[in-house]
Amino acid sequence: MNGINVTITDMMNCRDRRVSIQNELISKYDKPVLSFCMNIPGPVKTNEQIRKAFDSGKAELLKALSAHNITILHTEEFHEPSGDELIMALDAPAEDIKTLATEIEESHPLGRLFDMDVIGTDSMKLSRGTYRKCIICGCQAQDCARSRKIPWRNYRRRLRNY
């Protein structure tokens, strides 16, 4: 698959930056923050196909926020080898935002590859309440990821066929 291979260190640095931005936005606005990135197995975290899927998820998210009259207070967007990311401070209750995000993750054809986290003003991530299913086999996604029972190439094929 085309793209730049990233290391675990790259991913940890990306995570640290994301948490720092989330905390800054919560401090600045005293409102919940939504972080959207992709759950992509393997060493390549972005390329043209993955970006297309990310953009589709972003469009769906923006449409849902608009439909529910949720004001976007601040947006940060990154497209780096470690992946595509969108971080937003939103003027709405965290639970309402999480409900919208979960609906998108569950209804979009590639929603199982979307990672839409909502962080409340207490800096705690809201839980989905239910486990996500693997986009390939339908089992609990966490189990598939931990056991690596499905080769990452199968996920890439799914992206190509989207």
How would you describe each model-predicted region?
Residues 1-65, 96-120, 126-162:
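Long, contiguous binding/interaction regions
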Residues 64-100:
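Helix-adjacent hinge/juxtasegments
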